[in-house]
Amino acid sequence: MRIVVLAGGIGGARFLRGLRQAAPDADITVIGNTGDDIHLFGLKVCPDLDTVMYTLGGGINEEQGWGRADETFHLKEELAAYGVGPEWFGLGDRDFATHIVRTQMITAGFPLSAVTEALCDRWKPGVRLIPMTDDRVETHVAVELDGERKAVHFQEYWVRLRASVPAEAVVPVGAEQAKPAPGVLEAIGEADVILFPPSNPVVSIGTILAVPGIREAIADAGVPVVGLSPIVGDAPVRGMADKVLAAVGVESTAAAVAEHYGSGLLDGWLVDTVDADAVTRVRAAGVLCRAVPLMMTDLDATAQMAREALTLAEEVREA
């Protein structure tokens, strides 16, 4: 079975770990979000790609869900001693090495997709990880700070500001001009099932879908497209997805996120058991829906979520 998964960072990576256990013989291709990418200290940092790579490769800081295990921060301390920032973005020493290698390869002329493949040679994530595009795309958020409306990089909004001010707009800058990375459209066209994990529907999966050609390829693939709600009990499972959902006019509910994706894209939708009342509304929107436990409390629970998604995909296929 060939499975394509659109993935952001922590939520997507943890779901993928469960999917690997649930479908050990499947050929899994992950299309990773690069809208979170940021240039810091002259280096290209790809937080979501690295979170997937580290999580599946056994190098992630399990407690926080991002960054490396057994990390040290000597380089960050030295930069701070020179007065060089930003201090709010915590790159560790081991993590810096990844960004140095990536930036060296890109400077030498390699596209991000080839660089990601080379980095995965070390981590052996057990999936094929492809960035959504080799072109530069960075998500910016329009906010009002000190009475002034301005645009900040998504990382600044998420990490420094902790989404403490309302997001007035979310824009994946560069997405309209971007092209899908080599292998993206081919993987979608050859897939038996396409999954949207419980990643952020606006700044993770939404950004991937903003690259021209990707949404259309998924809609035209002719295979089940199944998503899992990142909203449980009208609140994000983790992170601050409600803040960016509000910016695009979507209420923070499991049903509203399904409607946001739309029946033209989505065939099946899993909601948590606490949101069982949403099933009727989602089905009325033309999307097959079931309520199952959606909390990724451990690997077994996550693997069961993945099995439920694949089961729903079969129901879609037979409908």
Curated annotation (Swiss-Prot):
Reactions catalysed, as given in the entry: enolpyruvoyl-2-diphospho-5'-guanosine + 7,8-didemethyl-8-hydroxy-5-deazariboflavin = dehydro coenzyme F420-0 + GMP + H(+)
The keyword Lyase is annotated on this UniProt entry: no
Source superkingdom: Bacteria
UniProt cross-references to InterPro entries, sorted A to Z: CofD, CofD-like_dom_sf, FbiA/CofD
Keywords for the protein's UniProt record, in alphabetical order: Magnesium, Transferase
Biological process terms in GO annotation: F420-0 metabolic process
Family: Belongs to the CofD family.
E.C. numbers: 2.7.8.28
Native organism: Streptomyces coelicolor (strain ATCC BAA-471 / A3(2) / M145)
Keyword Cell wall biogenesis/degradation part of the UniProt annotation: no
Pathway(s) where this gene product acts: Cofactor biosynthesis; coenzyme F420 biosynthesis
Any one GO molecular-function label of the UniProt entry: LPPG:FO 2-phospho-L-lactate transferase activity
Subunit structure: Homodimer.
Name the record gives this protein: Phosphoenolpyruvate transferase
Residue sites binding 7,8-didemethyl-8-hydroxy-5-deazariboflavin per the record: 50
Function description: Catalyzes the transfer of the phosphoenolpyruvate moiety from enoylpyruvoyl-2-diphospho-5'-guanosine (EPPG) to 7,8-didemethyl-8-hydroxy-5-deazariboflavin (FO) with the formation of dehydro coenzyme F420-0 and GMP.
Cofactor(s) named in the record: Mg(2+)
